[in-house]
Amino acid sequence: MEKEVIVVGAGLAGSEAAYQLAKRGIKVKLYEMKAKQKTPAHSKDYYSELVCSNSLGSDSLENASGLMKEELRILGSMLIEVADRNRVPAGQALAVDRDGFSEEITKILKNMENIEIIEEEFTEIPEDKIVIIASGPLTSNKLFEKISEITGEESLYFYDAAAPIVTFESINMDIAYFQSRYGKGDGEYINCPMNKEEYYNFYNELIKAERAELKNFEKEKLFDACMPIEKIAMSGEKTMTFGPLKPKGLINPKTDKMDYAVVQLRQDDKEGKLYNIVGFQTNLKFGEQKRVFSMIPGLENAEFVRYGVMHRNTFINSTKLLDKTLKLKNKDNVYFAGQITGGEGYVTAIATGMYAAINVANRLNGEKEFVLEDISEIGAIVNYITEEKKKFQPMGANFGIIRSLDENIRDKKEKYRRLSQRAIEYLKKSIKGV
């Protein structure tokens, strides 16, 4: 196969991918249409534009995002290096001057040997060249049609409607209990019971909680298939007890009675370290989710690894479609990276762009696949988005998806430090030849 790769999109994932390929002697055609045709989320012509926050998250190794950034530094990420140079004061967070950050990345890519930038919309996926699709959550309609053709339309999602996810260890099992409705199954659900007073306290806070403002491009089809929990509550004070909070079929083993309302949580990962709150798709602001959902008995000290979201977010069903190198299982020349894979957040986009590019470069240079285990945070996120599961929803960096330590450490900060230390040691041993 020709040593030329097409990279689609010069966002965070595409910019990192193009750089890593070019650095390894691979010729790159980088397609970026924003100079002629911007998506609704973008306003400038620079590459790697940060459309929301200017923060790439915590730099602390007690934080999974901080660990992922450190792993990217070890691997030689251009974007993290540029972010470090454009850092602005933000405590432990890596926040950047967003214009300085994007301008420098644009300049590097435009002046780099082996990179040809094509300022056009990419609409045809060739058979004879490797393509890394990093077109982001607002992929153009024409490219979207082509992706649909090669993946099957049922494998594409048009928006995010995701419930919050919490860690199992933060759920108070002195209050909550395992049980499946009507005794069917093996008690897979965690149930958080509410009496009448607790339910109405929760209801009253939920309906007046502050919601996130939707951007214009998110409004059209947002609620067609999924009603947010606060909208259900607003339709009637008892409506939730006939929907997501219905108690029927559940007997509380602590009282041998049916409760007034029950919030259910369902296992979200293979190891049982993460649980999502069933039916709690929401458009509440993150701080409000923490405040209101912590009123649920058993979740008073819940650790949220992901908050609920409802926004336009085109992504593929990566768990069904991609292998561990981020290549399509059914098409040997197509890789995906960035938010379109279901990886969430700036740093995850950079990581998947680098990961796909290293694998493509290794393949073209006759070297072995670069596959990281879930001991590292990058390996954990790739494992999460490629490991088959019944219902796939986007996920960003968090310690809940990384492999557990052999020993049980109660102090959370110490545990996270140990996980980070192990990840860094593992990664350094894994990068020979990378």
Regions found by a protein language model. Give the residues of each.
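Beta1/beta-strand and adjacent pyrophosphate-binding region of the FAD-binding site
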Residues: 2-13
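Predominantly flavin-linked oxidoreductase catalytic cores and closely associated redox partners
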Residues: 111-271, 275-286, 290-291
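A conserved beta-strand/loop capping segment in the N-terminal third of enzymes
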Residues: 60-106, 110
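A glycine-rich dinucleotide-binding beta-alpha-beta segment and adjacent secondary-structure elements
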Residues: 277-343, 350-352, 370-386, 392-398, ...
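N-terminal FAD cofactor-binding segment of flavoenzymes
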Residues: 19-81, 374-378, 382
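Redox-cofactor binding/interface segments in oxidoreductases and associated redox assembly factors
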Residues: 8, 132-134, 336
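C-terminal auxiliary extensions adjacent to catalytic cores
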Residues: 395-434
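Internal hydrophobic alpha-helix adjacent to the cofactor/substrate pocket in enzyme cavities
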Residues: 350-370
